[in-house]
């Protein structure tokens, strides 16, 4: 492993870099006050609103290119509304994971309340429309403001539920506990917990944050309209998807002759009956509603993928709820892609991967080797009835943790402040070893780079396959002490086969990509890979270490730079271009979730290069770290 750079001086509670425009300090008569961290407020509504405000502000700062202020107050001009927002800065992050206090409007009354999340959403939406010179700025605000309100309200409900029972259930597994930990959601998304169309009672049952669970809703599908595929094997023999479904359904179903069981999310089962194509199949007797049956399944962090401890498979169900930027219904090309990747790995690529990173448990992909769906009598897919059968590789003792869940702030029994499991692990390791929190955190980060990030880079370099390895798609495997020892990737949507490697991949698996729509131009692959693995995953983790006051971000940026330098020095043919890109490019392309939301884009629809809005941000590996690998700036006192 590369050596760690020397730990810099302790960083202050507010580390605020310089702001280039409108950087005057707030006037003394209307200066915001930091006070207690809003996320720790005992009132869950206040804590949830504070989280919503911070998410919106982080998005705005990143997507509009605001730099750091001179002092501890960030000024955000709102020309469309004729005012200025004064934002107290709790912590300024080189990687963008800033912490803010409640903002005020300049020149407002002294006793005016702080600006809440819903008001802030309206102000920022109006400003974005004004800057883009759109004619009706209020038209853009309607949907976003409603979804921000919904997200904040649901977050408050989740917080209240979790604070009443903060401990992990004794009957659960480490994997499920992590999946249920994302109480605040994506820290750089304006509406991370919005779930339009889900009632409060349904939300309690169907949400991982409330530790919900439910039996699956089953339908019987006539074989004449069944579509399915399987590369699932047991004892060397392929198991058909129909038999897998029968096994998961158990003995409680009474199937009509000539039909196959297909599981649905209970919310989707109700919604699908209102669709003309599905309703026609029910009316004609090609589909039969069997109702809920079997044991309870638990939603994972994606909400639509469900897990049952001890079951051989997880199920990725279609769910027409709009969650973050998309309605979460499986697409047929994604189902085929999961099977295709499983076959590709079994063609010898998985063995090469394991040989490159020997030792248990190593790194692998959580496979999606089978699926079931419904075609209409005309042979066209009936949307909303597609289900992926995913391997469940995790036993009850496997500490397999979704990275986003590991970094997420959550209540702990007997503690007044929110804290992540990462902070808990680092503190426990520091106490056990007698080392500083910063030293332990830095070593933990280096181990993560070598056990999780390096294998992902290898797959891109060796095979030309880039993974959409953002924090929610990436699982880190921990040893009993809490150190990273391996990793897993999951998601049949998130594969990028480089167009330049088409011939090589065809040689590995003839016909690859023909029906899965997985080959992507290299320039698009480079941009997406840099964002998902580089910005979202690793820089996001560095931001969490810093904003949670575990390790100075600049020290981890320097360590990451040294790791990338080593990774960029391998053989040319099998070297991923990502390390050099991150080391040498002064700016990076970054997904803009606020702008994506404002433009009403669905990330699962349309060409991969236009599904989301991307903006350009400064590369902190250059702006905060010198080429020698040492921190480039001194923190402000």
Predicted regions located by residue number:
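Nucleotide/phosphate-binding site architecture used for ATP/NTP-dependent chemistry
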Residues: 1-450, 479-637
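Beta-strand segments within the central parallel beta-sheet cores of soluble alpha/beta enzyme folds
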Residues: 470-472, 488-489
């Amino acid at each position: 492993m590369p050596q760690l750079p020397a730990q810099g001086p302790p960083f202050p509670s507010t580390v605020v870099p310089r702001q280039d425009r409108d950087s005057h300090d707030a006037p003394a008569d209307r200066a915001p006050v930091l006070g207690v961290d809003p996320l720790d407020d005992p009132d869950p509504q206040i804590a949830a609103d504070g989280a919503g405000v911070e998410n919106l502000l982080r998005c705005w700062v990143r997507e509009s290119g605001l730099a750091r202020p001179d002092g501890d107050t960030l000024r955000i001009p709102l020309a469309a509304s004729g005012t200025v927002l004064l934002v107290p800065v709790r912590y300024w992050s080189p990687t963008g994971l800033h912490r803010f206090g409640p903002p005020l409007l300049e020149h407002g009354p002294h006793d005016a309340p702080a600006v809440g999340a819903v008001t802030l959403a309206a102000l920022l939406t109006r400003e974005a429309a004004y800057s883009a010179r759109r004619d009706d700025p209020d038209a853009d605000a309607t949907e976003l403001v409603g979804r921000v309100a919904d997200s904040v309200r649901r977050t408050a409900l989740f917080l209240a539920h979790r604070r009443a029972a903060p401990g992990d259930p004794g009957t659960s597994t480490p994997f499920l506990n992590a999946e249920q930990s994302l109480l605040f959601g994506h820290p750089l998304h304006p509406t991370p917990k919005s779930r339009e169309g889900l009632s409060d009672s349904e939300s309690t049952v169907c949400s991982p944050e409330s530790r919900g669970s439910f039996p699956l809703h089953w339908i019987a599908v006539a074989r004449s309209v069944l579509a399915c595929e399987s590369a699932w094997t047991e004892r060397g023999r392929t198991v058909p998807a129909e038999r897998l479904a029968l096994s998961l359904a158990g003995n409680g179903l009474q199937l009509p002759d000539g039909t196959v069981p297909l599981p649905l999310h209970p919310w989707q089962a109700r919604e699908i009956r209102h669709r003309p194509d599905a309703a026609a199949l029910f009316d004609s007797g090609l589909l039969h509603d069997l109702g809920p049956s079997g044991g309870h399944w638990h939603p994972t962090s994606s909400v639509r993928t469900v897990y049952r401890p001890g079951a051989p498979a997880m199920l990725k169900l279609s769910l027409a709820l709009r969650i973050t930027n998309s309605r979460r219904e499986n697409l047929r090309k994604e189902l085929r892609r999961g099977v295709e990747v499983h076959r590709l790995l079994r063609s010898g690529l998985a063995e090469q991967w394991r040989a490159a990173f020997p030792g248990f448990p190593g790194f692998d992909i959580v496979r999606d080797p089978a699926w079931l769906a419904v075609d209409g009598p005309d042979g066209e897919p009936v949307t909303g009835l597609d289900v992926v059968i995913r391997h469940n590789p995790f036993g009850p003792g496997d500490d397999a943790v979704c990275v986003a869940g590991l970094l997420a702030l959550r209540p702990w029994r007997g503690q007044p402040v929110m804290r992540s499991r990462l902070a808990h692990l680092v503190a426990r390791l520091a106490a056990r070893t007698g080392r500083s929190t910063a030293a332990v955190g830095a070593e933990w980060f280096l181990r993560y780079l070598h056990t999780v990030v390096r294998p992902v880079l290898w797959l891109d370099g060796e095979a030309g396959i880039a993974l959409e390895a953002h924090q929610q798609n990436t699982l880190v495997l921990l040893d009993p002490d809490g150190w990273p020892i391996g990793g897993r990737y999951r998601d049949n949507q998130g594969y990028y086969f480089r167009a330049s490697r088409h011939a090589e991949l065809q040689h590995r698996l003839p016909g690859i990509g023909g029906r899965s729509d997985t080959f992507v131009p290299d320039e698009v692959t480079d941009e997406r890979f840099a964002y998902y693995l580089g910005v979202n995953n690793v820089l996001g983790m560095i931001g969490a270490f810093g904003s949670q006051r575990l390790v100075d971000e600049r020290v981890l940026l320097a360590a990451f730079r040294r790791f990338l330098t080593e990774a960029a020095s391998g053989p040319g043919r099998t070297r991923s271009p990502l390390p050099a890109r991150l080391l040498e490019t002064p700016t990076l392309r970054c997904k803009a979730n606020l702008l994506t939301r404002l433009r009403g884009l669905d990330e699962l629809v349309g060409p991969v290069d236009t599904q989301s809005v991307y903006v350009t941000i400064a590369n902190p590996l250059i702006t905060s770290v010198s080429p020698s690998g040492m921190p480039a700036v001194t923190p402000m006192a």
